[in-house]
């Protein structure tokens, strides 16, 4: 019997079998959670259905988080299947490729800035707002961040601003929803090799630097993030809310590695 037995959790942001969201889904499934998946576009539909079948997931629903009505439909459909549920994984971020390289000030536009923060940050609180009435007491809401929210990472640019906004969202949401027994946290992991990560210019250089500066000199894996997410979705972590949990081998505290 897993420690997520009888928990019903929605996982968003799955795009392929290598995605962090699917790694989290596998960890939740391993602990016997009942899952639902959402997907963004029809282009992803068949792939997400395949991955859902792999884990025995019965509920797969489209959702465009830039559209409030689409978010409302997502949770209306969830409520028809589950009535109430125990939380969701927000693994959603977006930035045009041209915003992930070069000079931040020169390349940024008002439209891109607005769209990136809307999809990458507002969507988290927008989803919470839409499903608040059907969340059980003791539910857990979890999102994914990165150290680029606090420190400058070359080429991360507007995504750093979006992640800073997202982390502030976590704190204010935790404050608002705590009286309902709902916890809100984020995982901030090291860079992980996924298809989307390679949109960031010089990603391999960032990856190698992070690994060399980590205290254990190891790459952070999707499994590392998934196991932490499973814990944060469980009652084992009921005393943790409003936190940014680092899963980065200690990189965030390191000014200089032992090998330097």
From Swiss-Prot:
MF (Gene Ontology): enoyl-[acyl-carrier-protein] reductase (NADH) activity; identical protein binding
Biological or metabolic pathway of the protein: Lipid metabolism; fatty acid biosynthesis; Cofactor biosynthesis; biotin biosynthesis
Site positions (Involved in acyl-ACP binding): 201, 204-205
Keywords: Biotin biosynthesis, Fatty acid biosynthesis, Fatty acid metabolism, Lipid biosynthesis, Lipid metabolism, NAD, Oxidoreductase
Catalyzed reaction equations: a 2,3-saturated acyl-[ACP] + NAD(+) = a (2E)-enoyl-[ACP] + NADH + H(+)
Coiled coil: none
Residues where NAD(+) binds: 13, 19-20, 64-65, 92, 163, 192-194
Pfam family for this entry, one: adh_short_C2
Protein EC: 1.3.1.9
EC category name: oxidoreductase
GO biological process: biotin biosynthetic process; fatty acid elongation
Location of the active site: 146 (proton acceptor), 156 (proton acceptor)
InterPro entries hit by this protein: Enoyl-ACP_Rdtase_NADH, NAD(P)-bd_dom_sf, SDR_fam
Functional description taken from the UniProt entry: Catalyzes the reduction of a carbon-carbon double bond in an enoyl moiety that is covalently linked to an acyl carrier protein (ACP). Involved in the elongation cycle of fatty acid which are used in the lipid metabolism and in the biotin biosynthesis.
Subunit description: Homotetramer.
Family statement drawn from the similarity comment of this UniProt entry: Belongs to the short-chain dehydrogenases/reductases (SDR) family. FabI subfamily.
Name this polypeptide is given: Enoyl-[acyl-carrier-protein] reductase [NADH] FabI
